[in-house]
Amino acid sequence: MIIDTTKLQAINSFYRSESLKEVYGLVWLLIPIFILVLGIVIGVLVIVWLERQISAGVQQRIGPEYAGPLGILQALADGTKLLFKEDLLPSRGDIYLFSIGPSIAVIAILLSYLVIPFGYHLVLADLSIGVFLWIAISSIAPIGLLMSGYGSNNKYSFLGGLRAAAQSISYEIPLTPCVLSISLLSNSSSTVDIVEAQAKYGFWGWNLWRQPIGFTVFFISSLAECERLPFDLPEAEEELVAGYQTEYSGIKFGLFYVASYLNLLVSSLFVTVLYLGGWNLSIPHILIPELFGINEMGGVFGMTIGIFITLAKAYLFLFISITTRWTLPRMRMDQLLNLGWKFLLPISLGNLLLTTSFQLFSL
């Protein structure tokens, strides 16, 4: 039997090329994910450092200064210390729920970064339902907190978990009509389309000016979703010791703090995308995207400028959130629920009704 070696070599080279294509495709899929995870880690470290420095400035004291220049490595030092601490488990608690609770909270928040555009087409998943996917994913995190509180077999932890669930439900509902209003104005629920819709009219086309009521409700609701002061009822130190975190130690305790700062960064980025024009910085008479060619340039420089503008706006919102922490006193639980159900929800629904009416009359 004579075998045609030419055909055999052609078949082998074809299979090799196909396998190489699969390998290259996998590599190109993993590289953006790795870069995003690295950027998120660096962003969280910067947020922790900023919060400590701003808090020290507000309280007129010296902040962290020993770990690295200006104390910039303090968060890394704290994380390393928590990593080597003993992982204690409650003797009569549900160990399974106790162990997976922090992981669910962190993973649910990490998935939200899939639909956040950091630049022109610089997004992992440009979905047609991007903003609603974020709302759906963010509702998973309180389940992890409730599991942690229940699995701890501690009354303070359980109360903290119940408060976290109640607070999340109370403030996700007013937040959703605000996002619906933005989708109506942009004729899309894709985060990339929402940014591009704002870029059509320059600086005054930002949804901040077109939706001031929605922006205010979204800002308050996002602070409550992040459980930041004055909405940190689930872990009120004076009442619940540390809430659902009471029985935790070591790396699991650190995961809750990572989840908190990740959630704060997600909220800041969504405020930037929905209301502040995303990667576009359109100053009157000076269009930065046109000046640098952000929307046309596909190179590294254009992407870098877009990422820088997005993060600059997000960190401005972070500065406001951190300052609010040391400005307003903590609310009572009844005040918190009344604010969400009796004030923010009717206002957000009224804003949605007005937006719908204007869109219908403008057709």
UniProtKB/Swiss-Prot annotation:
PANTHER family: NADH DEHYDROGENASE SUBUNIT 1, NADH-UBIQUINONE OXIDOREDUCTASE CHAIN 1. Its EC number is 7.1.1.-. Its main location: plastid. The chain crosses the membrane at residues 27-47, 104-124, 127-147, 248-268, 300-320, 343-363. Keywords: Chloroplast, Membrane, NAD, NADP, Plastid, Plastoquinone, Quinone, Thylakoid, Translocase, Transmembrane, Transmembrane helix. GO terms for biological process: aerobic respiration; photosynthesis, light reaction. InterPro entries: NADH_UbQ_OxRdtase_su1/FPO (IPR001694), NADH_UbQ_OxRdtase_su1_CS (IPR018086). It comes from Ranunculus macranthus (Large buttercup). NDH shuttles electrons from NAD(P)H:plastoquinone, via FMN and iron-sulfur (Fe-S) centers, to quinones in the photosynthetic chain and possibly in a chloroplast respiratory chain. The immediate electron acceptor for the enzyme in this species is believed to be plastoquinone. Couples the redox reaction to proton translocation, and thus conserves the redox energy in a proton gradient. The keyword Plastid applies. One of its GO terms (molecular function) is oxidoreductase activity, acting on NAD(P)H, quinone or similar compound as acceptor. Belongs to the complex I subunit 1 family. It comes from the Eukaryota. The keyword Chloroplast applies. NDH is composed of at least 16 different subunits, 5 of which are encoded in the nucleus. This is NAD(P)H-quinone oxidoreductase subunit 1, chloroplastic. It is a multi-pass membrane protein. It catalyses: a plastoquinone + NADH + (n+1) H(+)(in) = a plastoquinol + NAD(+) + n H(+)(out); a plastoquinone + NADPH + (n+1) H(+)(in) = a plastoquinol + NADP(+) + n H(+)(out). It is found in: Plastid, Chloroplast thylakoid membrane. GO terms for cellular component: chloroplast thylakoid membrane.
